Curated annotation (Swiss-Prot):
It holds the Pfam family Kinase-PPPase. It catalyses: [pyruvate, water dikinase] + ADP = [pyruvate, water dikinase]-phosphate + AMP + H(+); [pyruvate, water dikinase]-phosphate + phosphate + H(+) = [pyruvate, water dikinase] + diphosphate. This is Putative phosphoenolpyruvate synthase regulatory protein. Belongs to the pyruvate, phosphate/water dikinase regulatory protein family. PSRP subfamily. Its EC number is 2.7.11.33, 2.7.4.28. It comes from the Bacteria. Keywords: Kinase, Nucleotide-binding, Serine/threonine-protein kinase, Transferase. It comes from Pseudomonas syringae pv. tomato (strain ATCC BAA-871 / DC3000). ADP binds at G152, V153, S154, R155, C156, G157, K158, T159. InterPro entries: Kinase-pyrophosphorylase (IPR005177), PSRP (IPR026530). It is an enzyme of class 2 (transferase). One of its GO terms (molecular function) is phosphotransferase activity, phosphate group as acceptor.
Amino acid sequence: MKRSAFFISDGTGITAETLGQSLLAQFENITFNKFTRPYIDSVEKARAMVQQINNAADKDDVRPIIFDTIVNQDIREILATSNGFMIDIFSTFLAPLEQELSSHSSYSVGKSHSIGHNSNYMERIEAVNFALDNDDGARTHYYDKADIILVGVSRCGKTPTCLYMAMQFGIRAANYPLTEDDMERLQLPPALKQHREKLFGLTIDPDRLTAIRHERKPNSRYSSYAQCEFEVREVESLFRRENIPNINSTHFSVEEISAKVLVEKGVERRFK
């Protein structure tokens, strides 16, 4: 079964898309054609949006699912004339909150993602720069400033996890790829020993690692199953020997890996 889904906002669309994606992910038996439409902030754009929704309804022969965070009442009323199933995120959650808090909400566009009034903005940028500067073991002499250091074989998900933690939570995350030389020594590299309390390991199923590496360097020793299986086995042995907490990243998203890492290490998010 296939349905169209629209994430519509008069701002960036981040809130509508994030919540909408999370809800749709619960329906694994349905394939969704997803469309994000930010900055629908005028009557003209709203009318054009209605036409897009109606076209999708005609094409699919079933009404699309609409997630919106539209603040302007006139625009919301126009969208409501479409042949879509509307889920007004703000109204759904703000009305009961207003009642509970005995206060009216501001209904401001882009409030949650404002840069000018967000004291976390510079901290976020600094964390991202730190993750980039300390990617792939590039600058180990700055590890004393890291909140956490991810270790594991090449291509097991360290870099995207570090960047996600930096972007979302302001975490200063570095990562270090364990190589064959490190495995042959049967101990942690010198650069990591003095920061043992910050280490967290990522491992991965060998067949998944083989597929990922094959996309980068096909038909090479680096991407062979034998090499991947050897590296994973040796790194997992090192984790056990050095008592490094770790998780298998194979079946988890970057968001899930990040959350598990922070909980396991007890690292507090700089902002939420």
